[in-house]
Amino acid sequence: MVSFSKNKILSAAVFASVLLLDNNNSEFNNNLFSKNAKGLNSNKRLLHESQAHAGDAHHAHHVADAHHAHHAANAHHAANAHHAANAHHAANAHHAANAHHAANAHHAANAHHAANAHHAANAHHAANAHHAANAHHAANAHHAADANHGFHFNLHDNNSHTLHHAKANACFDDSHHDDAHHDGAHHDDAHHDGAHHDGAHHDGAHHDGAHHNATTHHLHH
């Protein structure tokens, strides 16, 4: 008859308990590691998604009160407006605030720090406008403020449209934008002909009478 001493039985019981405890700890550690790994993956995924949403839109958190911001990408033949604020059709606006159709707007290109610009980037056929504010047809405007055809205005003009932008006079005087700069060759019929600015391109819905009435929109042309 086989007999076991109390010490052997106790030792076996302790050994079994240690094995059970070790298995439980291993399972616990595995579960904990799995949960941590899932949490880490979740954090990585969140970071990746955040970065993905941050891509293309550079400093999108600076874009305030964007009107129709969903229209802000690849708008109409426009490119590279930097820091364009309150821009109406301002192009590829970087830090664009209160932008109406603010990205890749209307033939706008290379506008840097353009504020309150209507077609401010290369403001409606304006080339290399730097800090051009409210510049419409402003060409090579450097720090031009509220210039809407401003280089043709004078403070004594009683036309309401020009008086509205009269403060541009100091910035765009005749000596700065003389006839040689905006002569017939620069703004001739071929440049602003019917095919380029036809009814479909600038119809009533896009540029209504109140905004660009017929008598004041291309007065200098």
Swiss-Prot record:
The segment annotated Disordered runs over: 52-141, 180-221
Q: Which residue stretches does the UniProt record annotate as biased composition, category Basic and acidic residues? A: 52-67, 180-211
sequence repeat start-end pairs: 57-59, 60-62, 63-65, 66-68, 69-74, 75-80, 81-86, 87-92, 93-98, 99-104, 105-110, 111-116, 117-122, 123-128, 129-134, 135-140, 141-146, 176-180, 181-185, 186-190, 191-195, 196-200, 201-205, 206-210
Assigned keywords, A-Z: Malaria, Repeat, Signal
InterPro entries hit by this protein: Plasmodium_HRP (IPR008779)
| Parts forming coiled coils | none
List the biased-composition ranges (Low complexity). 75-141
What protein name applies here? Answer: Small histidine-alanine-rich protein
Origin organism is: Plasmodium falciparum (isolate FC27 / Papua New Guinea)
